[in-house]
Amino acid sequence: MNSVVLLSGGLDSAVNLAFARTEGNVKLALTINYRQRAAHKEIAAAAQLARYYAIPHRVIELPWLAEITKTALVRSESQLPEPKTEELDQLELAGKTAAEVWVPNRNGLFVNIAACFAETLHCEIVVAGFNCEEAATFPDNTPEFALAASAAMQYSTANQVKVLSYTGRLNKKDIVALGQRLQLPWELIWSCYRGEALMCGKCESCQRMIRAFHSLGLNLPQNFLMTE
């Protein structure tokens, strides 16, 4: 299958990129810059991953999305949630932290942008980095979302593009394990909400990745602030 991969440079999208290569021809990796805090880090990580796998890479600029987003993922004056590891699976708390980093219709917008390229490049699928952990509080991370988006694209694309995530039913531990099997270059990824010199080790994205690595007895990538 020919595919376009949405690549943020983070854990989920990087593993999906690596897996998509085993399933067919990845014609393009797309990174979206919506002025998120970690934009420059995500773009750099995505570019390195695309270069590593010899895949064309393109950055799409969406500055207006930052203008209408009022949450901490974009607004530097807002405090990012820093849940403790033991709080990650508490749904009520997770729902609150999700609301603090929500971006309006983000994944809906992203998969449709990718579908434009997929149609033009004669690709059957758009690959996105979803996971079942965050699907509990982010409905646009669910298999149901992918199916609904695919259904709409039966009408909106000439070649009936579908949305697919190879990790949509996996938790972070399983995703890291899959990345290990695929020999993913962990040192190239960026899975932090912040855009500092090193991944902070405190935000929810970092916490979920740290828990996954520790549960598998793996050392964290060297670009973590909190390394063993």
UniProtKB/Swiss-Prot annotation:
<feature type="binding site">
    <location>
        <position position="206"/>
    </location>
    <ligand>
        <name>Zn(2+)</name>
    </ligand>
</feature>
<keyword id="KW-0067">ATP-binding</keyword>
<dbReference type="GO" id="GO:0008616">
    <property type="term" value="P:queuosine biosynthetic process"/>
</dbReference>
<comment type="pathway">
    <text>Purine metabolism; 7-cyano-7-deazaguanine biosynthesis.</text>
</comment>
<dbReference type="InterPro" id="IPR014729">
    <property type="entry name" value="Rossmann-like_a/b/a_fold"/>
</dbReference>
<feature type="binding site">
    <location>
        <position position="203"/>
    </location>
    <ligand>
        <name>Zn(2+)</name>
    </ligand>
</feature>
<dbReference type="GO" id="GO:0005524">
    <property type="term" value="F:ATP binding"/>
</dbReference>
<keyword id="KW-0479">Metal-binding</keyword>
<dbReference type="GO" id="GO:0016879">
    <property type="term" value="F:ligase activity, forming carbon-nitrogen bonds"/>
</dbReference>
<dbReference type="GO" id="GO:0008270">
    <property type="term" value="F:zinc ion binding"/>
</dbReference>
<comment type="subunit">
    <text>Homodimer.</text>
</comment>
<comment type="similarity">
    <text>Belongs to the QueC family.</text>
</comment>
<comment type="function">
    <text>Catalyzes the ATP-dependent conversion of 7-carboxy-7-deazaguanine (CDG) to 7-cyano-7-deazaguanine (preQ(0)).</text>
</comment>
<dbReference type="InterPro" id="IPR018317">
    <property type="entry name" value="QueC"/>
</dbReference>
<feature type="binding site">
    <location>
        <position position="200"/>
    </location>
    <ligand>
        <name>Zn(2+)</name>
    </ligand>
</feature>
<keyword id="KW-0671">Queuosine biosynthesis</keyword>
<keyword id="KW-0436">Ligase</keyword>
<protein>
    <recommendedName>
        <fullName>7-cyano-7-deazaguanine synthase</fullName>
        <ecNumber>6.3.4.20</ecNumber>
    </recommendedName>
</protein>
<feature type="binding site">
    <location>
        <begin position="7"/>
        <end position="17"/>
    </location>
    <ligand>
        <name>ATP</name>
    </ligand>
</feature>
<keyword id="KW-0862">Zinc</keyword>
<keyword id="KW-0547">Nucleotide-binding</keyword>
<dbReference type="Pfam" id="PF06508">
    <property type="entry name" value="QueC"/>
</dbReference>
<feature type="binding site">
    <location>
        <position position="192"/>
    </location>
    <ligand>
        <name>Zn(2+)</name>
    </ligand>
</feature>
